[in-house]
């Protein structure tokens, strides 16, 4: 699978979330094959902006400096569902505060404009990479 990236210089804003802003790491966009299926994979960083959420999150053990989440998203070939290959809470230096693991339960992305945009952006990046 893909390694946990350092906080990349290649973050592109995909949109707002309930508690922050989602950025995709354009350098991490790739295709992967898992269990016989192909996925569009990329790391994304959700930078938390909701102060109430941050205050609550920082109550946890080793979470005092948490500022964002780094997540490995794997979208199906249609872009309507994704699974989470890895999920980490990190501090401002990119150090892992918590490893939240993977979630292989498919999530419907059709009604989430930010996730649909993230998929579309990643797909365009992959298309550009393939032309180089």
PLM region spans:
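N-terminal signal peptide c-region/cleavage motif recognized by signal peptidases
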Residues: 3-5
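N-terminal secretory-pathway/extracellular module detecting exported/lumenal segments
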Residues: 7-70, 74-132
């Amino acid at each position: 699978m893909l390694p946990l990236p350092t906080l990349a210089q290649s973050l592109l804003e995909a949109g707002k979330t309930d508690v922050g802003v989602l950025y995709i790491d354009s350098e991490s966009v790739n295709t992967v094959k898992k269990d016989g299926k192909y996925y569009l994979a990329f790391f994304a960083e959700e930078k938390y902006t909701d102060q109430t959420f941050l205050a609550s999150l920082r109550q946890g053990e080793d979470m005092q400096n948490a500022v964002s989440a780094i997540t490995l998203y794997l979208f199906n070939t249609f872009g309507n569902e994704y699974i989470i290959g890895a999920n980490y809470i990190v501090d401002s230096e990119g150090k892992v505060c918590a490893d939240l693991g993977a979630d292989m339960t498919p999530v419907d992305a059709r009604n989430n404009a930010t996730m649909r945009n993230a998929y579309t952006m990643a797909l365009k990046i992959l298309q550009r990479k393939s032309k180089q």
